[in-house]
């Protein structure tokens, strides 16, 4: 037996992880190479059997990167392995829907919900605490409450920190502009937008230097245009996009040609002005102070733009905890990684999404950040999870390069889809397409992603938050005033649904008790049951269902306007 080994049954940590005591001789080896939580359990009664590894993987962040990463780790690693998610918020929210929240087209509850129960349903631990710092040499993360959590592998998915303080007067807290980077910001922006509608004026949608993922800024400008047209107020509200890009459509990747031309044409068509090569200097009440640069990085002019309402993308930094962890992050607090998304000095630490450092794709006079999207973030997640699993098996890691940029942007009645591959020039693909199908695709993608996060294990039992429970509760509240109601929708087609005799009687009795027509109640319950059914599908079947659904929708759509 090697030095430092322990013998004599399962430890408390192993028991808590679900191991049951058996009559075996078990030897635990503590491997300093990965951390104190990692153990190899070798069973003497199974000669020739492969070594079983118990590992603890900690995921920091419970957003569009962290939660899918935790789900994937739980699926790919062994049942003896432990996954813990740490987040300073107890809820998940779908960030790409924030522009809709800021326009009032979505409510907070539509795209945000407590994440703890969904993690617990998959056997994933959840700690709702802020991260203070990381101690890589000790394989520990230190939390705001003074506690420390040990790990064998650490996956960082914190997202960026909005650095409002780098520009005087910017931001929703103590500043004069709004933000939609977070759901709370978007809710506050919508409240301000409603007040703005009472006394309209110019709107500025801006992007600050060192901001990243700037595509949503254009999206918000087009959504504001669409919303104001619906309200018959567009002629009262000039809209201007202010960007550090050398030209519209650069998007942090140097998009030219088709991308630049289509976006410029779309902005002109919608009457949206734009100012490029603009650096935000400060914001005062109703005034944006900017400097414009030429291609050589020389200031050409400094002036102010008036606004009555503004949404501005701030500079991005890494989370404070990452910046406070020596040897982990660059000068702006982003985690430096190699091509395998590992920290070069700490190969058991991985970083994904916007919390990691990105190389400069295309140099510009004013710094423009990388164009991350849900697609590229999920690519990061897949790579990091696969490499953690490979490390546990003693296999070689796989590279995340070359990467591609791909996203969908809603424009109200239409939308734009952008794809460039690889993300770093020289490129094989670089195009942007517009069409009303993009708007529909983004709606479908939101639905798919939220269903994926809410996916419950097949053995789970329905809770009181199901659609069926909601439908019945609503009917009981409306009892006595429930005249027969047809489900709206021009594409509705009647289905003949066979019911067992007892269930048919049950339906009629329930309908009579609730004072509602039996066919109406049957339709409501069937609609609700179909919605609930999605929660119990495997990820593979859910993805296939969404694909077939899109095909069925496409078959039934009238021919839309041609792509431009």
What are these regions, as identified by a protein language model?
Residues 375-401:
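Internal hydrophobic alpha-helix adjacent to the cofactor/substrate pocket in enzyme cavities
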Residues 55-125, 209-253:
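Beta1-alpha1 glycine-rich phosphate/pyrophosphate-binding loop at the start
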Residues 32, 48, 121-219, 223-232, ...:
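FAD-binding core/adjacent interface of flavoenzyme oxidoreductases
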Residues 417-463:
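C-terminal auxiliary extensions adjacent to catalytic cores
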Residues 404, 464, 532-564:
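Short, positively charged interaction helices/loops
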Residues 163, 172-197, 306-377:
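FAD-site-proximal beta/loop scaffold in flavoenzymes
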């Amino acid at each position: 037996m090697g030095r430092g080994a322990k013998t004599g049954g399962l430890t408390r940590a192993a028991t808590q992880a679900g191991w049951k005591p058996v009559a075996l001789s078990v030897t635990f080896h503590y491997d300093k190479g990965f951390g104190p939580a990692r153990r190899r359990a070798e069973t003497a009664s199974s000669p020739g059997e492969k070594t079983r590894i118990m590992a603890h993987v900690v995921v920091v962040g419970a957003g569009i990167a962290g939660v899918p990463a935790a789900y994937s780790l739980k699926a790919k690693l062994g049942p003896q392995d432990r996954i813990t998610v740490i987040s300073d918020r107890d809820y998940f929210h779908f960030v790409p829907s924030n522009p809709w929240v800021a326009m009032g087209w979505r409510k907070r509850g539509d795209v945000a919900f407590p994440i703890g129960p969904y993690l617990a349903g998959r056997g994933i631990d959840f700690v709702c605490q802020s991260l203070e710092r990381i101690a890589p040499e000790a394989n520990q993360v230190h939390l705001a409450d003074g506690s420390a959590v040990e790990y064998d592998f650490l996956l960082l998915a914190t997202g960026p920190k909005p650095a409002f303080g780098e520009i005087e007067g910017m931001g929703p807290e103590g500043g004069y502009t709004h933000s939609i980077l977070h759901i709370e910001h978007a809710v506050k922006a919508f409240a301000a937008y409603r007040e703005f509608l009472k006394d309209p004026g110019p709107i500025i949608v801006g992007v600050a230097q060192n901001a990243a993922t700037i595509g949503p800024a254009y999206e918000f400008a087009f959504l504001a245009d669409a919303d104001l047209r619906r309200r018959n107020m567009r002629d009262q509200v000039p809209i201007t996009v202010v960007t550090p890009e050398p030209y519209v459509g650069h998007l942090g990747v140097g998009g030219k040609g088709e991308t630049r031309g289509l976006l410029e044409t779309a902005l002109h068509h919608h009457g949206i002005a734009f100012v490029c090569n603009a650096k935000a200097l400060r914001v005062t009440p109703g005034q944006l102070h900017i400097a414009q640069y030429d291609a050589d990085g020389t200031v050409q002019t400094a002036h102010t733009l008036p606004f009555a309402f503004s949404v501005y993308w701030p500079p991005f930094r890494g989370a404070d905890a990452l910046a406070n962890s020596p040897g982990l992050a660059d000068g702006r607090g982003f985690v430096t990684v190699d091509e395998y998304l590992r920290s070069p000095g700490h190969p058991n630490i991985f970083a994904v999404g916007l919390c990691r450092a990105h190389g400069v794709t295309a140099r510009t006079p004013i710094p423009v950040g990388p164009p991350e999207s849900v697609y590229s973030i999920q690519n990061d997640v897949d790579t990091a999870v696969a490499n953690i699993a490979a490390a546990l098996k003693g296999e070689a890691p796989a590279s995340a390069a070359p990467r591609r940029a791909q996203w969908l942007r809603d424009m109200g009645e239409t939308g734009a889809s952008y794809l460039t591959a690889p993300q770093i020039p020289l490129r094989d693909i670089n195009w942007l397409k517009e069409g009303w199908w993009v708007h529909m695709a983004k709606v479908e993608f939101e639905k798919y992603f939220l269903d994926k996060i809410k996916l419950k294990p097949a053995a789970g039992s329905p809770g009181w938050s199901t659609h069926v429970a909601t439908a019945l509760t609503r009917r009981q509240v409306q009892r006595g005033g429930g005249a027969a109601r047809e489900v709206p929708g021009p594409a509705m087609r009647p289905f003949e649904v066979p019911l067992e005799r007892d269930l048919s009687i049950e339906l009629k009795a329930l309908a009579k008790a609730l004072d509602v027509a039996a066919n109406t109640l049957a339709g409501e319950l069937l609609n609700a049951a179909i919605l609930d059914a999605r929660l119990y599908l495997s990820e593979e079947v859910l993805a296939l269902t969404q694909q077939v659904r899109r095909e069925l929708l496409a078959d039934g759509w009238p021919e839309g306007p041609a792509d431009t």
